[in-house]
Regions:
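N-terminal auxiliary segments of SAM/dcSAM-dependent transferases
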Residues: 2-88
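Solvent-exposed, non-membrane alpha-helical residues enriched in polar/charged side chains
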Residues: 25, 76, 112, 116-119, ...
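S-adenosylmethionine
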Residues: 147-152, 156-304
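Generic structural signal for secondary-structure transition and capping sites
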Residues: 53, 80-84, 123, 228, ...
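SAM-dependent Rossmann-like transferase core, predominantly class I methyltransferases
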Residues: 58-63, 69-149, 155-168, 182, ...
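Alpha-helical elements of Rossmann-like donor-binding domains used by nucleotide-donor carbohydrate transfer enzymes
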Residues: 23, 43, 70-73, 113, ...
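A generic alpha-helix signature
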Residues: 11, 15, 19, 36, ...
Length: 305
């Protein structure tokens, strides 16, 4: 690791955990009551030490010179606006440790909730076929596989770069039997690569792009300057395009089996419209509009009759 100039100001008085923690927080420009900066500090210390907070205390962890250099570099990058997950090259999703970088969107807690709700609908221990549309880093597909290793899981995405990251994550986690396919869901024949299967899927789940492009100007630079725009934004004129295409495919193309579940993550302003889209189609039942932990309408689930 290349050393960098350590900026002006004091370095930690010593290499003890308490001193290093306070020093990182100060370099980030935070204060002890700043929850976000405390969280970023904890993530940096977790990464540089290879230990969680409790383990650092129990093991009386001390920072060596290499750790201090790494922390200094990370602080500089974070203050320039880079997401902490990209800086560390890792994130946690549904208890699964994932490699993450600018090839794919950073997984969010709301998406964990979608996985949890869909898993709750599965009462059989038999193998299911599961399709993740817009898989990105593979977070949903891999989280599902971690909970139901007997299932056959396929992740599709329009991005070569995202799929390469998903494959790497699958290998790292020992889930090399997952299927990863390059598919642009908005193409006229979006599932040519995967619709050759003899039967449909038992679960179709998707966290598609859903932010209208007009909202870009009000979003944080940490998001819009670093995360892939293609995974974030849709046109203002047709914000439900992915939902319409996927729901139609589940019915008209037989992607979803009878009794199978469809699960969407949605923009809170359009969740009701997605619910209405499915409610207008008599082939669906048990349609549910679910709120996230902040109380915002965020997920729509439905079962095919």
């Amino acid at each position: 690791m290349n050393k960098i100039e350590r900026e002006k100001g004091p370095w930690p008085a010593n290499n003890l955990l308490s001193s290093v923690q306070a020093w990182v927080l100060e370099r980030l420009g935070g204060h002890p009551e700043d929850r976000e900066m405390r969280s970023v500090t904890r993530m940096m210390l977790d990464a540089v030490s290879g230990l969680d907070r409790g383990q650092r205390i129990v093991n009386d962890w001390k920072a060596n010179e290499s750790a201090l250099d790494a922390l200094a570099q990370w602080c500089v990058r974070f203050k320039k606006g880079e997401p902490i997950q990209y800086i560390l090259g890792a994130t946690s999703f549904f208890g699964v440790s994932l490699k993450i970088d600018a090839r794919a969107l950073i997984p969010r807690p709301e998406t964990e909730e979608l996985i949890r709700h869909l898993l709750d609908q599965q009462s059989t221990s038999e193998s299911l076929r599961v399709l993740d549309v817009g898989t990105g880093s593979g977070c949903m597909a891999l989280a599902w596989k971690s909970q139901r290793p007997q299932d056959e899981v396929t992740g599709v995405d329009a991005s070569h770069e995202a799929l390469s990251l998903a494959r790497e994550n699958g290998v790292d986690l020992g889930f090399e039997d997952l299927n990863w396919e390059l598919v642009d869901v908005l193409n006229p024949s979006p599932f040519d690569a995967v619709s050759k299967a003899k039967k449909g899927w038992d679960v179709v789940m998707s966290n598609p792009p859903y932010i209208p492009i007009s909202e870009r100007q009000s979003m944080e630079n940490r998001v819009i300057l670093h995360e892939p725009s293609s995974a974030l934004f849709v046109s203002d004129q047709d914000p439900l395009s992915f939902y319409v295409t996927i729901a139609s495919g589940c019915l008209k193309e037989g992607w979803l089996t009878a009794g199978g579940w469809l699960g969407f993550e949605c923009h809170e302003e359009f969740a009701s419209a997605v619910e209405a889209l499915l409610s207008d189609q008599p082939e669906w039942r048990a349609i549910r509009l679910l709120k996230d932990l902040q109380g915002a309408p965020r997920m729509v689930l439905a079962q095919k009759k």
